[in-house]
């Protein structure tokens, strides 16, 4: 008959557990005093700071017997406080991997905003199999495993050698070789890569480190994202086609808006102080330019017109877009350029002229941030639609025009640059591998992005899986929400919403 544990014995076990010592825990009775030779020490982040080893043991034990748990604590505090992360070692490698598959980026613990981060500790990476495993390509199909071993054994001890075979059992002309150390694998790469061309092969032998699971997952996500972005771009060009069909209606509205008799209708519009008659006329000209560019896609004339270059080039002038003393008369006089552009429907617009459409960025702030009165809501709604179509066209045609410079400026500024009210987005459920460049490329088709940032956990240096994107106008932000909210990447669906205003929390 087994005697119950005394209170002193139970208290001693709790102390051993809380100190993070290698105390053999429940479920470990079938194991020796030490974990298996290939056991993995795992780092676990995003755990509540209030949790001790006892709560963590209950979390991990369903996946296998736990050998050791060590909570990282800040020793500068008295008593030492948890840093919200720990190390855990299971008795078996299988248990550690099962726990990682079930918890990493999946389970969110009580009181935490982000899911658990679980990965092999840095000390385990020094000799991980993925760091010692080589891929051998352009191998003669006449070779077997023994031939490959003989070829690579001079570089060190080989733990595993396997030729990749098809369903028919025949070699596919490639193999995997795992050495005992990474240094051996590196020596094999230096000596063997492209050193010879084997029988029946068209190229020299390829020797490189095998792709890791993370590499494969990242490549799969990139391919999936590329396909989905292609679909988005196709939809964007479809919107442009629709714009071309309705252009005469929009041009009529824009011309009417720029006439001297109608300028008074805009007096009641909020935030229109910086948008003068010439800017509205420029917007009308851009609509005509978009129509000409759309028509030119099917034209057989390959010679760009110099008149188109001069007309579109004028649109990019910051003076034309920002002159505060422009008059209605000057705006009406400049409508001659609009007539010129309308006459180009059957002509080809050269690439330089399409590049000139980037000048639309100067118009982004005024129209998108406008509040409307009842009298002008219908007209401005049509203007907004026309402007949105032109904007999406320019972003689709010139996806790399400003992405690199934007990231450089953002990095130099060191902080998140925000757009006007209603133009700032909060994006949840981003893939772990996404960085600033990825999120920027994803949201560029909807307008002029002035800032794109993925947030990184300073302790783990891993993505927090959320970020911000700011446009220079609310129209683009709403277009991005409509297209990207619920957009699936891998196993995740993006959640895209407007960033809450700073004034929302104020009672007045």
From Swiss-Prot:
It is found in: Nucleus; Cytoplasm. Residues 40-123, 132-212, 423-501 form the RRM domain. Keywords: Cytoplasm, Disease variant, Epilepsy, Intellectual disability, mRNA processing, Nucleus, Repeat, Repressor, RNA-binding. GO terms for cellular component: cytoplasm; Flemming body; intracellular membrane-bounded organelle; nucleoplasm; nucleus; ribonucleoprotein complex. It comes from the Eukaryota. GO terms for molecular function: mRNA 3'-UTR binding; pre-mRNA binding; RNA binding. InterPro entries: CELF1/2_RRM1, CELF1/2_RRM2, CELF1/2_RRM3, Hud_Sxl_RNA, Nucleotide-bd_a/b_plait_sf, RBD_domain_sf, RRM_dom. Expressed in frontal cortex. Isoform 1 is expressed in brain and lung. Isoform 2 is expressed in heart, brain, placenta, lung, liver, kidney, skeletal muscle and pancreas. Isoform 4 is expressed in heart, lung, skeletal muscle, kidney and pancreas. Its main location: nucleus. Pfam families: RRM_1 (PF00076). One of its GO terms (biological process) is RNA processing. Residues 1-283, 357-508 are annotated as: Necessary for RNA-binding, TNNT2 exon 5 and NMDA R1 exon 21 inclusion. RNA-binding protein implicated in the regulation of several post-transcriptional events. Involved in pre-mRNA alternative splicing, mRNA translation and stability. Mediates exon inclusion and/or exclusion in pre-mRNA that are subject to tissue-specific and developmentally regulated alternative splicing. Specifically activates exon 5 inclusion of TNNT2 in embryonic, but not adult, skeletal muscle. Activates TNNT2 exon 5 inclusion by antagonizing the repressive effect of PTB. Interacts with A1CF. It is linked to Developmental and epileptic encephalopathy 97: A form of epileptic encephalopathy, a heterogeneous group of early-onset epilepsies characterized by refractory seizures, neurodevelopmental impairment, and poor prognosis. Development is normal prior to seizure onset, after which cognitive and motor delays become apparent. DEE97 is an autosomal dominant form. Belongs to the CELF/BRUNOL family. This is CUGBP Elav-like family member 2. It comes from Homo sapiens (Human).
């Amino acid at each position: 008959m087994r005697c119950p544990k005394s209170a002193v014995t139970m208290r001693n076990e709790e102390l051993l557990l809380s100190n993070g010592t290698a105390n053999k825990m429940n479920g470990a009775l079938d194991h020796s005093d030490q974990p298996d030779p290939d056991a993995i020490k795992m780092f676990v982040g995003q755990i509540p700071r209030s949790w001790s080893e006892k709560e963590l043991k209950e979390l991990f034990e369903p996946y296998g017997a736990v050998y050791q748990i060590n909570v990282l604590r800040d020793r500068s505090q008295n008593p030492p406080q948890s840093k919200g992360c720990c190390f855990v070692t299971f008795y078996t490698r299988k248990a550690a991997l099962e726990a990682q598959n079930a918890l990493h980026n999946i389970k969110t613990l009580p009181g935490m905003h982000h899911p658990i981060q679980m990965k092999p500790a840095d000390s385990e990476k020094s000799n991980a199999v993925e760091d010692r495993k080589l891929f051998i390509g352009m191998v003669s199909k006449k070779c077997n495993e023994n031939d490959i071993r003989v070829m690579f054994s001079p570089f060190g001890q080989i733990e595993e050698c396997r030729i990749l075979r098809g369903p028919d059992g025949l070699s596919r002309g490639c193999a995997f070789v795992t050495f005992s150390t990474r240094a051996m694998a590196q020596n094999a790469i230096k000596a063997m890569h492209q050193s010879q061309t084997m029988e029946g092969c068209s190229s020299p032998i390829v020797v490189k480190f095998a792709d890791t699971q993370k590499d494969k997952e990242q490549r799969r996500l990139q391919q999936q994202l590329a396909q989905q972005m292609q679909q988005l771009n196709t939809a964007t060009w479809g919107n442009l086609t629709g714009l071309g069909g309705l252009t005469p209606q929009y041009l009529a509205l824009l011309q009417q808006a720029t006439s001297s008799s109608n300028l008074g209708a805009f007096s009641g519009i909020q935030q229109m102080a910086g948008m003068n008659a010439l800017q509205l006329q420029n917007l009308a000209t851009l609509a005509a330019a978009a129509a000409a560019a759309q028509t030119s896609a099917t034209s057989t004339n390959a010679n760009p017109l110099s008149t188109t270059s001069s007309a579109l080039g004028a649109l990019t002038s910051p003076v034309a877009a920002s002159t505060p003393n422009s008059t209605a008369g000057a705006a009406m006089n400049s409508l001659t350029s609009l007539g010129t552009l309308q006459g180009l429907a059957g002509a080809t617009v050269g690439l330089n002229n399409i590049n000139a459409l980037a000048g639309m960025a100067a118009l982004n702030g005024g129209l998108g941030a406008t509040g409307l009165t009842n009298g002008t809501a219908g007209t401005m709604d049509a203007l907004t639609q026309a402007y949105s179509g032109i904007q999406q066209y320019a972003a689709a045609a010139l996806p790399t025009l400003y992405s690199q410079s934007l990231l450089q400026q953002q990095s130099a500024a060191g902080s998140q640059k925000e757009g006007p009210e209603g133009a700032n987005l909060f994006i949840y459920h981003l893939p772990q591998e996404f960085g600033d460049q990825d999120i920027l490329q994803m949201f560029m088709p909807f307008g002029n992005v002035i800032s794109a940032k993925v947030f990184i956990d300073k302790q783990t240096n891993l993505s927090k899986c959320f970020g911000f994107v700011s446009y220079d106008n609310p129209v683009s932000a709403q277009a991005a929400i409509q297209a990207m909210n619920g957009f699936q990447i891998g196993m995740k669906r993006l959640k895209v919403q407007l960033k809450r205003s700073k004034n929302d929390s104020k009672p007045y």
